[in-house]
Design a protein with these regions (language model features):
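Non-heme di-metal
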Residues: 2-382
């Protein structure tokens, strides 16, 4: 048991964090990264640190000229997707730290969320970098984001689960049910269950956001890159996509741990919320399909149209469902990628670029091979 009754920035009690649940355990004390309950979160932290990059490393000199050659339909596709991605990363640039970290009770997940939020901030800076280099007046994009009805309509479903959890958590924190004398009362048990249920929904929402909602925009950016247009922007989006894959994996492991032995109450909630999660997926796919129609209302890009994008969204959603132990419910089978050419953009190893020309996406910072044996270099001669 901990003597801490409430929240603290530094817990002076001795707590074995290898035996704690991911959330709602005792407050954290010493940040130590030598032993873990869930080593995968430290691995994901190391990956993100190794992938660290800055948007200024990618040249956008050609993109400004390319943008001027686009027709009206293509400019609509490019600009609308930028606006939507700015919305998503504005949410994720503060969401994990604002909503999840205050209730995190293992250091490896806390550290993972710290770098997660930092990388999302870099994504937001990247959109500013693109806009400042491509558009003569950046305000034409930024100032119109909150005037776009299509963007605002999607913002509500993207942020609702976050906001619901934040409001429930605030009410719980300002009440008395978390105090030692009240914790075991029926009302307190209901309140903590409701709090955990809202956390589950918020994390599921983030998994869908990171794993599905970005991908229509990604595919459009890569389609321009395939046509040798706006290649600098496409490379930046490729770097962002690589990061988002890591962030999706964080939320995926949180959800899967709850289905196992992390927290018995969360395991029950996961079972009870299964149909709700399916409905969240259905809503996201429906909204992304409508977004694809809106993007291509004036015309398509060579190699890409709204119908192909809609199949791609379904294919992606089925993959995400399977990764959290749920069944595929959409028509496009996992075995048939409708946009196979996107694969090399989403895989940093598939990007073949000259180092002097652009950012090398497969380059890792601080990556060291530690399993070298005494005979590893036996075949080498000087």
């Amino acid at each position: 048991m901990t003597s801490v009754d409430g929240m603290t920035v530094f817990n002076t009690d001795q707590v074995d964090t290898t035996k704690q649940t991911m959330f709602f355990g005792p407050p954290l004390g010493v940040q130590r990264y030598d032993k873990f309950r869930y080593p995968i979160f430290d691995k994901l932290t190391q990956n993100q640190l190794g992938f660290f990059w800055r948007p200024e490393e990618v040249s956008l000199q050609k993109d400004r000229a390319d943008y001027q050659t686009l027709n009206k339909a293509q400019k609509h596709i490019f600009t609308s997707n930028l606006k939507y991605q700015i919305l998503l990363d504005s949410v994720q640039g503060r969401g994990p730290g604002m909503a999840f970290m205050p209730y995190c009770s293992i250091p490896e997940l806390e550290g993972c969320m710290n770098i997660w939020q930092t990388m999302e901030m870099i994504h937001s800076r990247s959109y500013t970098h693109i806009i400042k280099n491509v558009y003569s007046d950046p305000s034409e994009v930024f100032d119109k984001i909150l005037e776009d009805d299509k963007i605002l309509a999607r913002a509500q479903s993207v942020t609702k689960a976050y906001d619901d959890f934040l409001n429930v958590a605030q009410e719980y924190g300002t009440g008395n049910m978390w105090r030692d004398g009240w914790k075991e009362s029926p009302t307190a048990r209901w309140e903590i269950n409701n709090l955990k249920r809202n956390l589950y929904r918020a994390v599921a929402n983030v998994y869908i956001l990171e794993g599905i909602r970005f991908y229509v925009s990604f595919a459009c950016s890569f389609a321009f890159g395939e046509l040798k247009l706006l290649e600098g922007s496409a490379k930046i989006i490729g770097l962002i996509a690589r990061d988002e894959s890591q962030h999706m994996t964080v939320s995926q492991h949180i959800l899967n741990n709850w289905k196992k032995d992390d927290d018995p109450e969360m395991k029950e909630i996961a079972m009870e919320e299964e149909e709700n999660v399916y409905n969240m997926f259905r809503q996201a796919v429906d909204e992304e399909n409508l977004w694809a129609e809106y993007l291509f209302k004036d015309g398509s890009i060579i190699g890409l149209n709204d119908k192909l994008l809609q199949k791609y969204v379904e294919w992606t959603a089925n993959k995400r469902l399977k990764s959290i132990g749920l069944k595929a419910i959409f028509d496009t089978p996992i075995s048939n990628n409708p946009l196979p050419w996107t694969a090399h953009w989403l895989s940093s190893k598939g990007m073949q670029v000259a180092p002097q020309e652009t950012e090398v996406e497969s380059y890792l910072i601080g990556s060291i091979k530690q399993d070298v044996k005494k005979d590893t270099f036996a075949g080498f001669q000087l």
